[in-house]
Amino acid sequence: MEDFVRQCFNPMIVELAEKAMKEYGEDPKIETNKFAAICTHLEVCFMYSDFHFIDERGESIIVESGDPNALLKHRFEIMEGRDRTMAWTVVNSICNTTGVEKPKFLPDLYDYKENRFIEIGVTRREVHIYYLEKANKIKSEKTHIHIFSFTGEEMATKADYTLDEESRARIKTRLFTIRQEMASRGLWDSFVSPKEAKRQLKKDLKSQELCAGLPTKVSHRTSPALKTLEPMWMDSSRTAALRASFLKCQKK
């Protein structure tokens, strides 16, 4: 699993995941499933914010390329991936500036358009079960929850999915591809619980149908918001590999 993670994810994401685990005294070489889960969660958070800006009129827009001097503000502030001290500093700054209630737990993102913190979840189980666990832990109506699964399912607070359908489909496609690549290496069953692995086998046909319904359009350009990170999903060689894997999935 460790080799898979280092091959599958952008080195910057791998480095951030390693730092996060070491901060809690965990070893990526031993707790490899957690290592993979953290990398996946980081990538989803970055993909969630990618391309989304607020223009000078306060409107939310999607920009893949354009005038670098345009008066655009990133729609999302990312806390996930920062060390805890810096992340809380960002949260406190947002709360002081906007008047939004400070969350009890460290959130993943802040949405400047909707003026709310967002908790992102990526689950190997049923989305509604994981959603309820998150909601029970957070115990705050102020923090928006958005859960994704590896089978293309999602669930969000009050069915408000924040992003446009194409942006969410890009995330779902990536998660499904990660699952397919794990399965091809015999790693998927160990990534989920034994009970869940059996249930997932029964859902294979349904999952393939979901895969066939997802868009294949993938941008080769790097978002201005993430040029310093150069995320894996915008890397041309990896994008080509993802598309090839995805098209193969469609033909099954």
Swiss-Prot record:
Name of the protein in its database record: Protein PA-X
GO BP, one annotated term: viral RNA genome replication
Active site (record annotation): 80, 108
Main location, first listed in the record: host cell
Organism this protein belongs to: Influenza A virus (strain A/Pintail/Alberta/119/1979 H4N6)
Family: Belongs to the influenza viruses PA-X family.
Role: Plays a major role in the shutoff of the host protein expression by cleaving mRNAs probably via an endonuclease activity. This host shutoff allows the virus to escape from the host antiviral response. Hijacks host RNA splicing machinery to selectively target host RNAs containing introns for destruction. This may explain the preferential degradation of RNAs that have undergone co- or post-transcriptional processing.
GO molecular function, one term: RNA binding
The record's note on its domains: The probable endonuclease active site in the N-terminus and the basic amino acid cluster in the C-terminus are important for the shutoff activity. The C-terminus acts as a nuclear localization signal. The C-terminus is recruited to host protein complexes involved in nuclear Pol II RNA processing.
Record site feature (Important for efficient shutoff activity and nuclear localization), residues: 195, 198-199
Sections of the chain in a coiled coil: none
Record keyword Nuclease present: no
Keyword Acyltransferase: no
InterPro entries according to UniProt: PA/PA-X, PA/PA-X_sf
Compartment(s) of residence: Host cytoplasm; Host nucleus
Domain of life the protein comes from: Viruses
Name of a matching Pfam family: Flu_PA
Site location (Important for efficient shutoff activity): 202-203, 206
Keywords, ordered alphabetically: Decay of host mRNAs by virus, Eukaryotic host gene expression shutoff by virus, Host cytoplasm, Host gene expression shutoff by virus, Host mRNA suppression by virus, Host nucleus, Host-virus interaction
